Amino acid sequence: MNSTQKKLSYQIGLGILFLTFFITTTAQTKAINKFYLHAGAGWGTYESGLFDLGVQAIIKNKWSATLSYQSLTMRPKNRPADYQPETGYVLFIPYTYEVEANMTITSLTAGRYFKLGKNTWATTEGGLSYVSGDKVNFERTEVTSGNIIIAASTTSNYQTTKETKSSVGVAMRADLNWGFASFMGLGCGVFTNINSIQSPIGFQVKLIVGKMGREKKNKHKTEGL
């Protein structure tokens, strides 16, 4: 990581600490209209699967801020077109081993809040991320096979090595949420992260738990004349 990336990473860390402190100290005030944790899962480009955990605050019914952590497993972006995975069986149970690239993304984003209905809302945000992920190197090699009656294997036609790289990325996300209870809701959203390691685009669904800021039902009273 070069000095610029280290500086940006330090700034992101300070931003995360500030946001956490701000949300913790003001969550009970009128400035924070909604405050909730979210946990989600989804999929995206590069045949990726992902898990997302974070916290989001809606401020003054106008702004939103999110601190999130994502863990992704993906097909390496530089995987050769003729790549063949290792295959075989053990105790007559077949298996396939494909090399994967793992990535973690810690993001601090902020943006706008849009009220869509009584208890539905959307957010659009952008910000910076600290990204750590695998860079996979492929080297062509000879395919070999072997078996011992109850087990057999055929190696891949590429030998692989992994390096862990770090980068600063640009994060963008848009989410749609529905608070079906005062403390719980559901959501879905899309995201992307542009960085020098591998830039995924994905979709996720999530469960949200916290202060939903649901509107109370209006009770009409009829007064006799």
Mark where each language-model region is.
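Bacterial Sec-dependent N-terminal signal peptides
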Residues: 1-32
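Compositionally biased, intrinsically disordered low-complexity regions enriched in proline and serine
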Residues: 3-6, 11, 37, 84, ...
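Intrinsic low-complexity, intrinsically disordered segments enriched in polar/basic residues
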Residues: 6-7, 21-26, 84-92, 160-162, ...
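Short glycine/proline- and aromatic-enriched beta-strand/turn motifs that initiate or cap beta-hairpins
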Residues: 26-73, 77-79, 208-216, 225
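Flexible, solvent-exposed coil segments and beta strand-coil junctions
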Residues: 29-36, 84-92, 149-156, 180-186
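Outer-membrane beta-barrel transmembrane domain signature
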Residues: 44, 57-59, 98-225
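Surface-exposed acidic loop/strand-edge motifs in secreted or periplasmic proteins
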Residues: 73-109, 132-134
